[in-house]
């Protein structure tokens, strides 16, 4: 990442942190727990070389170190690698995507540093449909990794059903509103969530591209 792009990313992250602290009592530190397990703020790894891929593996590692196993909706999950990794870690995960796809045949285990073959018979639960807020009634945590057209719906569903969420907003495609001129899409979404009473935090993963995420714990853990 060039120095100018890094400055912009750092400024955006600081803005998101400022927005997040507006929630409730201007302090979110004391509610960072999910199912009794403390949620650790991810260390800033921007000084390290960024990975060109492995974003699902990186998110998987972040999730299992920051949340206890729960029922996950992998929204726009495509081939289902993230869901597969979570299931292997003892979670219940379901892909919600209108276009069913087969799992990849192999992936890189970034912890062990080796390629892992996936059984050709392996499958992940799949709901072949566009995400609807009503789907959230059956899940504890909603995940959207660059899930086009679903970010606002994920936030709305979290409010209605008390789910936690983890999103990596990217393009403003098929969303019900657009950010005002000069306002970043992540800022707009963070502000929207906070205005609805959601306590959220920004975090970063070490991959190239839009690597800033927003997460919120389960509503039951905020009370």
What name fits each language-model region?
Residues 137-153:
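A short SAM/SAH-binding and catalytic strip from SAM-dependent methyltransferases
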Residues 178-223:
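Active-site capping/gating segments
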Residues 154-164:
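A short glycine-rich, Lys/Arg-flanked "PGG" loop and its adjoining helix->strand segment in the class I
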Residues 2-73, 81-84, 88-89, 101-139:
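S-adenosyl-L-methionine
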Residues 92-98:
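Conserved SAM-binding motif I beta-strand of class I
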Residues 162-176:
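Conserved beta-strand signature within the Rossmann-like core of class I S-adenosyl-L-methionine
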Residues 78:
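Conserved glycine-rich SAM-binding loop
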């Amino acid at each position: 990442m060039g120095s100018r792009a890094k400055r912009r990313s750092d400024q955006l992250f600081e803005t998101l942190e400022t927005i997040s602290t507006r929630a409730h009592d201007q302090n979110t530190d004391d509610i960072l727990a999910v199912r009794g397990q403390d949620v650790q703020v991810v260390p800033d790894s921007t000084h390290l070389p960024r990975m060109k891929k492995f974003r699902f593996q990186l998110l998987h590692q972040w999730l299992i170190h920051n949340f206890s196993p729960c029922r996950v909706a992998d929204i726009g999950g495509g081939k289902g690698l993230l869901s597969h990794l979570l299931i292997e870690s003892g979670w219940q995960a379901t892909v919600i995507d209108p276009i069913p796809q087969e799992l990849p045949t192999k992936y890189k285990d970034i912890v062990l540093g080796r390629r892992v073959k996936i059984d050709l018979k392996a499958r992940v639960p799949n709901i072949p449909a566009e995400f609807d807020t009503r789907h959230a009634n059956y899940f504890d945590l909603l995940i959207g990794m660059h899930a086009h057209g679903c970010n606002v719906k994920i936030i709305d569903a979290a409010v209605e059903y008390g789910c936690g969420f983890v999103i990596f907003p990217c393009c403003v495609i098929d969303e019900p509103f657009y950010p005002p001129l000069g306002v970043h899409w992540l800022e707009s979404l963070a502000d929207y969530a906070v205005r609805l009473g959601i306590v959220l935090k920004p975090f970063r993963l070490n991959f190239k591209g839009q690597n800033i995420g927003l997460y919120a714990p389960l509503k039951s853990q905020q009370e």
